[in-house]
Amino acid sequence: MKKLEILNLRGNKIVDIKVLEKVNFKELKKLSLSDNKISDIKVLGKVKFEKLEILDLSQNKISDINILEKVNFKELKQLGLFNNNISDIKVLEKVKFEKLEELNLPGNKISDINILEKVNFQELKVP
């Protein structure tokens, strides 16, 4: 799977994604894990997706996104986290997604968005 560029696992019943740290996805550009039953994404701190541009974790059961502070996805342009259980987005102040253009957070439990004035995503597009 070294040359795999797109992995779409949308709409399954996936709960555990720890296997990602054991697989070599050097060329992966798009990973869709949306519409599953994932709640723990800590494994993302252990994987190396050097070319990942799109990560879709929407429609899962994710509540804790603090691991995003430790991931190093230099090429990430789109991050989908809509329809999860996220309430705290303070970690966004610390993440280093220099090329992020699109961040999708609708359908969560976020009540305080004041942190957004401190977020520095150089390429983020606002409609």
Task: Kindly give the residue locations of the regions a language model identified.
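Low-complexity/repetitive intrinsically disordered segments
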Residues: 1-19, 32, 109-127
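Intrinsically disordered, low-complexity segments enriched in polar/charged small residues
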Residues: 34-35, 42, 64, 82-83, ...
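Conserved hydrophobic beta-strand positions in leucine-rich repeat
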Residues: 4-9, 28-33, 52-57, 76-81, ...
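A structural signal for leucine-rich repeat
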Residues: 1, 17-26, 41-49, 65-74, ...
